[in-house]
Amino acid sequence: MFTLTSYFGFLLAALTITSALFIGLNKIRLI
């Protein structure tokens, strides 16, 4: 169960980083 929790935590971190980069690119395009 610990490995499953860490796996979901890794997915959440990856999703957050990806969304942050996507928003950053959109802001750069708007400028």
Curated annotation (Swiss-Prot):
Per the record's keyword annotation, is Thylakoid included, yes or no? Answer: yes
State which residue ranges cross the membrane. Answer: 4-26
Q: Which UniProt keywords apply?
A: Chloroplast, Electron transport, Membrane, Photosynthesis, Plastid, Thylakoid, Transmembrane, Transmembrane helix, Transport
Assign the protein's first listed, main location to one coarse class. plastid
Q: Does the keyword Transmembrane helix apply?
A: yes
A Pfam family per the record: PetL
Q: Which InterPro entries does this UniProt record tie to the protein?
A: Cyt_b6/f_cplx_su6
Q: Name one GO molecular function term.
A: electron transporter, transferring electrons within cytochrome b6/f complex of photosystem II activity
* CC annotations in GO: chloroplast thylakoid membrane; cytochrome b6f complex
What SUPFAM superfamilies does UniProt report for this protein, alphabetically?
A: PetL subunit of the cytochrome b6f complex (SSF103436)
> What HAMAP family does the database record attribute to this sequence?
Cytb6_f_PetL (MF_00433)
What does the sequence similarity comment in the record state about its family? Answer: Belongs to the PetL family.
| Quaternary data | The 4 large subunits of the cytochrome b6-f complex are cytochrome b6, subunit IV (17 kDa polypeptide, PetD), cytochrome f and the Rieske protein, while the 4 small subunits are PetG, PetL, PetM and PetN. The complex functions as a dimer.
Q: What is this protein called?
A: Cytochrome b6-f complex subunit 6
Q: What is the lineage of its organism?
A: Eukaryota, Viridiplantae, Streptophyta, Embryophyta, Tracheophyta
